[in-house]
UniProtKB/Swiss-Prot annotation:
Keywords: Cell inner membrane, Cell membrane, Membrane, Protein transport, Translocation, Transmembrane, Transmembrane helix, Transport. It is a single-pass membrane protein. The keyword Cell inner membrane applies. It is found in: Cell inner membrane. Part of the twin-arginine translocation (Tat) system that transports large folded proteins containing a characteristic twin-arginine motif in their signal peptide across membranes. TatA could form the protein-conducting channel of the Tat system. The gene is tatA. GO terms for biological process: protein transport by the Tat complex. This is Sec-independent protein translocase protein TatA. The chain crosses the membrane at residues 4-24. GO terms for molecular function: protein transmembrane transporter activity. It comes from Gluconobacter oxydans (strain 621H) (Gluconobacter suboxydans). The keyword Transport applies. Belongs to the TatA/E family.
Amino acid sequence: MGSMSPVHWLILAVVLLVVFGGGGKISGLMGDFAKGIKSFKKNMADDESMTATDATQAPGHISPPNQNPGYSQTTSSETHRNQV
């Protein structure tokens, strides 16, 4: 009971690192973390506004496929017939 276990030594080491060397680094990390959360929330709000804009478009509107006038699709049997 009187001796310190490895868990106690680990906690003591972390506390000493924070007190003597990591105070500024930890506050910087927390600031970066907060900026990341704010950016995430902002982007989520932007996505929701884009979804609302998409929902206002006509529900039956389907854009036509791209038409390439210089391209004709041929099957492999047609190609084989043309080569023989």
